[in-house]
From Swiss-Prot:
Native source species: Rippkaea orientalis (strain PCC 8801 / RF-1) (Cyanothece sp. (strain PCC 8801))
Highest rank taxon of the organism: Bacteria
InterPro entries in the record: UPF0367 (IPR020885)
Family membership noted in the UniProt record: Belongs to the UPF0367 family.
Protein name: UPF0367 protein PCC8801_1959
């Protein structure tokens, strides 16, 4: 399962949706990046493949960051994507 996390302006908690295939995650990432670069704000409607009833709509001009990360196996440790603990031995 691949997670796409959106960080929104003035919001400390990210919005997450999941994709089963890396190609689908990459396509969604590109769609979000394209919307962020658009000169006029648009509404992005996102769904989740893990929780099929989950839907979210966000304005593209409110997105400040996008993180794509693997969420199965050893990567599902509960830590924020892209960070690790230097104290582990």
């Amino acid at each position: 399962m691949i997670s796409i996390d959106l960080t929104l302006k003035y919001t400390p908690i990210p919005i997450s949706v999941q994709r089963k295939e890396s190609e689908a995650a990459e396509a969604l990432y590109q769609e979000i990046i394209t919307a962020m670069r658009s000169p006029s704000p648009i509404v992005l409607e996102l769904t989740c493949e893990k929780q099929t009833e989950k839907k979210v709509a966000v304005m593209s001009d409110q997105i400040s960051g996008v993180i794509v990360s693997q969420k199965d196996g050893a990567a599902a440790t509960g830590r924020a994507p892209g960070f690790f603990s230097a104290a582990e031995s």
